[in-house]
Design a protein with these regions (language model features):
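Intrinsically disordered, low-complexity cytosolic regulatory tails
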Residues: 1-38, 77-80, 297-308, 315-387
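Catalytic-loop of the protein kinase fold
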Residues: 170, 175-188
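Conserved catalytic-loop aspartate of Hanks-type protein kinases
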Residues: 242
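Regulatory alphaC helix of protein kinase catalytic domains
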Residues: 96-101
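Glycine-rich ATP phosphate-binding loop
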Residues: 66-87
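Short beta-strand micro-motifs within the conserved protein kinase catalytic domain, predominantly
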Residues: 113-124, 132
Length: 387
């Protein structure tokens, strides 16, 4: 078999030259095929089996798919992650289409790059760039060597990267509401650069949804502990639903506690989110901090960071900031943290001005959102509740 000429790695037809430079030309899709069939590399199942040593190294699993590490051998060698969807599930098929039908979302450094796909019979696969440092969830909750524990500055940088990725999704045409923002869907590359992943539940919506009062009515789905409570009550999905989920992520990154942990409920009589927010209201933010972190946090930066998490996790969507505002505030906090570490002068009063004392908010319609408010049969509290 004679290999066909490799495509020009700098051609505008190939948005990811570092991957496309070594691929042989794929079979031309039918003209009636979906647009994404002409945007991404089409692999054969034989190629994926060869790349993964017959799917021998599983690196992740979710309700409707498994993820395997693979190696594409060619003119430019590349380690990849291959997602294998459950071939007996209609939901898996829908999730595959959700990943493939949002092609423009890949054009941002903080969004995971889709390389290609494979369809063979009822089998569906997607191929992504490989993230050596795994997920933020894994870094926060696995029993890591203390030497590799994420520093406060590194956590800030990761949060900024993730926020930029979400902001990008919220600013396109159409807009994308991710609907599953959580630490396990924020991946980390070799340089600890954060990338948003897993668009199985995402919704494409018109740009008019950028208006604060606009929404999409949809079946409630997401992960318990990260779902917007306003979305739970009303069934109305907005851009601010992602903002709420990111607020939970900010608190989790700071504390290394999962939102569904029962230890706080048993000790304090309140759930983790209520405890986080109460600590901010009572100016006890230090109690939230991951005790494994060294004392390296500028106090004013800590207060400002906690205030952003507090505002994002407001039960009322209209009171939450936009992701653009979140990015700006986090970048400012990182700047002052760097000044603090370098012993350079900065203005704590200026930083404190973005973190006024929070005010308590009344629960939505008198509802308190305990973990028992949603029941999911055959799943534990960490599993996905999908539509």
């Amino acid at each position: 078999m004679v290999a066909s000429k490799s495509p020009d790695p700098y051609s505008a037809k190939h948005p990811f030259p570092n991957f496309f430079s070594f691929w042989r030309k794929a079979k031309k899709p039918n003209e009636d095929s979906p647009p994404w069939t002409r945007l991404y590399r089409m692999f054969t199942l034989k190629e994926l089996r060869l790349a993964t040593d017959n799917f021998g190294l599983k690196i992740g699993q979710d309700g409707h798919y498994s993820v395997y590490k693979g190696f594409i051998n060619g003119g430019f060698n590349e380690t990849v992650a291959i997602k294998m969807y459950d071939n007996n599930s209609l939901i898996s098929h829908r999730h595959f289409l959700s990943e493939m039908e949002l092609p423009w979302k890949r054009d941002h450094p903080n969004v995971l790059s889709l390389i290609g796909y494979c369809i063979q019979g009822s089998h569906r696969y997607t191929v992504f760039e490989y993230m050596p440092h795994g997920t933020v969830h894994g870094q926060l909750h696995s029993k890591n060597d203390p030497k590799t524990l994420l520093s406060w500055k590194k956590r800030l940088e990761i949060c900024i990267g993730a926020a930029r990725g979400i902001q990008f999704l919220h600013s396109g045409n159409p807009l994308i509401i991710h609907r599953a923002i959580k630490p396990s869907n924020i991946l980390l590359d070799n340089n600890w650069f954060a990338k948003i992943s897993d668009f199985n539940l995402s919704k494409m919506v018109p740009t008019r949804l950028s208006d604060s009062d606009s929404h999409v009515s949809t079946v409630i789905c997401g992960t318990l502990g990260y779902i917007d409570p306003e979305y739970i009550v009303s069934g109305l999905l907005t851009l601010k639903s992602d903002v709420y989920s990111f607020g939970v992520v900010l608190f989790e990154v700071l504390s290394a506690r999962k939102p569904m942990e029962r230890s706080i409920l048993e000790e304090q009589g309140i759930n983790v989110m209520q405890w986080w927010r109460q600590c901010v209201e009572d100016d006890r933010v230090g109690e939230i901090m991951d005790p494994r972190m060294k004392v390296e946090v500028a106090p004013d930066c800590l207060k400002a960071y906690a205030d952003i998490a507090y505002k994002c996790s407001n039960e009322r969507g209209s009171e939450r900031p936009s992701m653009a505002d979140v990015v700006k505030r986090l970048e400012l906090i990182l700047l002052f943290q760097e000044c603090f570490e370098a012993d350079l002068p900065f203005s704590p009063s200026w930083l404190a001005s973005i973190a006024p004392s929070p005010k308590k908010n009344e629960p939505l319609s008198g509802v308190e959102f305990q973990d028992s408010d949603i029941s999911v049969s055959d799943y534990d509290s960490e599993e996905l509740l999908r539509d």
